[in-house]
Amino acid sequence: MNGKFEGFIKLAGKFISILQGRKKVLGLFDKKTQKEQEDYFDHVWNTRRFRYMFKILFNKKMLAKRGLVADYFTFDDGSKSFADSFYNRSRKAFRDIPIQSNYFTSLYLLGKYNSLNVVPAYLKEENFETIKSRVDRIKIFTNEAQKWIDTIPDHTIDCFALSNICELMSEKETHSLFSSVIRTAKDDARIIFRNLMIPREVPEDLRNSIKKDEPLSKKLFDTDRSFVYGKVAAYTVQKNGNK
């Protein structure tokens, strides 16, 4: 978590831990069933002080101090403010997503992984040899996405993970990026991208080639263990447009 926003979320996690107290935080991670977790959130965790904390942390002045500008944010989740939106997202993470398997929440609240068995797949011991044998396949490029993708030959990529990079792009820049995705993608290539606060979608005139998988998108969003994103969406590139 090294970016400005990631650093802010890390700070918010520390603040929540102090506010709730270590005993209450550990109590959340002790819940073994979903019903126990839901009841704990409803009757122990979700205090007036906890809810008010979001108004303190997630406001324009506080965000500006952390180098984040909130003026461009809009909401497509029914929230009236930045604070309301992030309260709703935290509620989902702490109440509805199984806490025992959520290593993101563990990092946010405990500052560490709570169990060696509940870590990202790349950190699991059983995957070490596979990763070690294939590490030469990893290539790191530091550049703007559009400049990088312009160097890639046609029909060569089978997966795109675009995070939320479109949020600060203009409509023209977004259209250019997704046009390049179509050009460089193999047929049936998969795409995943996210929205933090600004609603973004594949440009309408490209949707015949980039088709959204609505059921998979809903499943990914409903089970997303990182609560900060307001949208998780999956797509398939279909170059003939008629599958």
Model-derived segments and their meaning:
Residues 1-133:
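Class I S-adenosyl-L-methionine-dependent methyltransferase module
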Residues 157-172:
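A short SAM/SAH-binding and catalytic strip from SAM-dependent methyltransferases
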Residues 214-243:
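Core SAM-dependent methyltransferase catalytic element
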